[in-house]
Amino acid sequence: MFLKLLDKLGRKKTVLDRGPSHPKYNEAKPWMNRYYLLLRHRPKWFPFNILIHEMLADDHGDGVHNHTFPYITIILRGGYWETLKSGKFWRSPGYMGFRSANNLHRVDLKKGTKPLTIFISGPFGLRKGPRSEYGIDFKTKK
């Protein structure tokens, strides 16, 4: 009910699994519903934001990604598999993760679930380090 209220207030954004510059943009599918609890359009100078993420699909492609800011994530519902350099871990409801901007990771969902998280993004910064696959075969998720 709370998410429906945020939607009615214009605080929801559906993020697709690829952007308009992608050659197969016409095949884009919803990847995540993002609900803005604090700022819908956060200025870069503002130090943080608070959102709710409703994940609809696995992370794009076969590799890992990082963020342009440090962040905290708190799982409210569902859970997901997170792949880090140190291995693949199940993150269940109640899990709280603290990540730096140069942390590389990948999120994969359990089939038929839509995990819900509180996502607190920190101050913007530049990405550090290369995106790599850590030697993990992401196609087989091993």
Q: At which residue positions do the language-model features occur?
A:
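Short, conserved beta-strand element in jelly-roll/cupin
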Residues: 66-81
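A short hydrophobic beta-strand segment most commonly corresponding to one strand
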Residues: 98, 112-129
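A glycine-rich, hydrophobic/aromatic-adjacent loop/helix-cap motif
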Residues: 18-25, 123-125, 135-142
